[in-house]
């Protein structure tokens, strides 16, 4: 089994990473950061997001596992005291692969049809560069839906629906549903300006094209990465053809993750 381990970088996570590497040597596992079969993140959800983006070019070949050393690990199945058990499972078991939908983002520019493509595990957001009101036309399946005015828009995956989207009042969507969700960030609604005012859930075969109105520069976030785009013609969102693969060695249902993360964990916290 070829593996690689990405650490959050703090002393606790680094120590755990080195401990795991030493244990894996006992099982003759091969550390391979270029062509791994399994990618283990040690830290929190942010560390797993970094691991996802580092290996997003080979998603069909790798499976991810999270060991969380922080306060909240929605994507992390394993705790520090369980790493020896995890290593034994990796060595001895044919692990189950769980696939989650991803978000495809295509930024189109006014420069000769140039465009860039991104993938998000959690969400993407759109805002203005200087914090002024974002004014955009929102199109769904090639038809004008609304003109949005507000602080911004958040477009999330089902697994990402528990992150920024939840804070915006969006719905929690089970990752077995191939969909994306559009949530408003502080929209302007009055007698003059009007938006739908509710999150929208779009199925896989629907695309959403968001076109800036009188904005030269758009600030986006793709998960944890902030990007500035100039001369934007439009940004298209849809459910990606690719999926992220998680290695499961024991059951950890989505709704149990939600319960443990937001209501009460098993240790009563």
Curated annotation (Swiss-Prot):
Keywords: ATP-binding, Cytoplasm, Kinase, NAD, NADP, Nucleotide-binding, Transferase. The keyword Transport does not apply. One of its GO terms (cellular component) is cytoplasm. The keyword Membrane does not apply. GO terms for biological process: NAD metabolic process; NADP biosynthetic process. It comes from the Bacteria. Its cofactor is a divalent metal cation. InterPro entries: ATP-NAD_kinase_N, ATP-NAD_kinase_PpnK-typ_C, NAD/diacylglycerol_kinase_sf, NADK. It is found in: Cytoplasm. Its main location: cytoplasm. NAD(+) binds at residues 45-46, 122-123, 149, 151, 186. It catalyses: NAD(+) + ATP = ADP + NADP(+) + H(+). Its EC number is 2.7.1.23. GO terms for molecular function: ATP binding; metal ion binding; NAD binding; NAD+ kinase activity. It holds the Pfam family NAD_kinase. The active site is at residue 45. Involved in the regulation of the intracellular balance of NAD and NADP, and is a key enzyme in the biosynthesis of NADP. Catalyzes specifically the phosphorylation on 2'-hydroxyl of the adenosine moiety of NAD to yield NADP. Belongs to the NAD kinase family. This is NAD kinase. It comes from Staphylococcus haemolyticus (strain JCSC1435). The gene is nadK.
């Amino acid at each position: 089994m070829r593996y690689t381990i990405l650490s959050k970088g703090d002393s606790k996570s680094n120590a755990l990473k080195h401990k795991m590497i030493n244990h894996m040597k006992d099982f003759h596992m091969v550390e391979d950061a270029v062509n791994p079969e399994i990618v283990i993140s040690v830290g929190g959800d942010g560390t797993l997001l970094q691991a996802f983006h580092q290996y997003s070019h080979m998603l069909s070949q790798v499976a991810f596992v999270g060991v969380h050393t922080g306060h909240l690990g929605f994507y992390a199945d394993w705790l520090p005291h369980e790493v020896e058990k995890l290593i034994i499972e990796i060595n001895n078991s044919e692990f189950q692969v769980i696939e989650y939908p991803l978000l495809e983002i295509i930024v189109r520019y006014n420069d000769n049809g140039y465009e860039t493509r991104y993938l998000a595990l959690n969400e993407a957001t759109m805002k203005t560069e200087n914090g002024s009101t974002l004014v955009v036309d929102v199109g769904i399946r090639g038809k004008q839906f609304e003109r949005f005015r507000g602080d911004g828009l958040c477009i999330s995956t089902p697994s990402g629906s528990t992150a920024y989207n939840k804070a915006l009042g969006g719905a929690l969507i089970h990752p077995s549903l191939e969909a994306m969700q559009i949530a408003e960030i502080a929209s302007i609604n009055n007698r003059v300006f009007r938006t739908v005012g509710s999150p929208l859930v779009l199925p896989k075969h629907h695309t959403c094209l968001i076109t800036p109105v009188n904005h030269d520069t758009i600030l986006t976030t793709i998960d944890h990465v902030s990007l500035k785009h100039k001369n934007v013609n439009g940004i298209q969102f849809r459910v990606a053809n690719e999926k992220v693969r998680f290695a499961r060695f024991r059951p950890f249902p989505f709704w149990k993750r939600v319960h443990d993360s937001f209501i009460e964990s098993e240790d009563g916290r």
